[in-house]
């Protein structure tokens, strides 16, 4: 199934530049699993910069879990290709924390975009926590 992902990037955008390695590819193209790992890596780096990364949340007994995601892939990157990855977070709504991603070539050709909804979870209780309640 194909989803249309409409993304409005905000001031809290974070950017990462990467190059696709042979280990990330199959038949010369980026593996789908590697695409989502790249998204996960930039999300983690951005969360760390915002003070809500893994090392910030774990001492509070909290973690982020993905509830759903969707992506539109126009073309998979090729081995050796240099890319620009951008992410931003959206407005929290009913406990859900949206995060958006866009993947470009160095020439700004849009290759893929994705939207993911995260929820903040209590590690012990295994229930959702409102981010506004966390200090």
Model-derived segments and spans:
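Hydrophobic residues positioned within well-ordered beta-strands of beta-sheet architectures
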Residues: 14-16, 69, 85, 99, ...
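A short acidic/small-residue loop/turn micro-motif
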Residues: 118-120
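Hydrophobic beta-sheet segments that form the core/acyl-binding groove
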Residues: 70-106
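Hot-dog-fold acyl-thioester-processing enzymes
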Residues: 5-66, 109, 113, 122-135
């Amino acid at each position: 199934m194909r989803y249309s992902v409409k993304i409005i990037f905000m001031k809290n955008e974070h950017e990462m530049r990467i190059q696709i390695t042979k280990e990330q590819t199959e038949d010369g193209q980026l593996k789908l699993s590697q695409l989502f790992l790249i998204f996960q890596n930039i999300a983690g780096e951005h969360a760390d910069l915002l003070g809500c990364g893994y090392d910030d949340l774990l001492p509070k007994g909290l973690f982020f879990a993905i509830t759903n995601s969707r992506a539109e892939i126009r073309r998979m990157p090729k081995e050796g290709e240099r890319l620009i990855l951008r992410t931003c977070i959206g407005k929290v709504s009913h406990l859900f924390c949206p995060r958006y991603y866009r993947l470009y070539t160095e020439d700004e050709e849009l290759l893929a975009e994705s939207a993911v909804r995260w929820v903040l979870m209590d590690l012990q209780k295994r229930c959702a926590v409102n981010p506004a309640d966390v200090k």
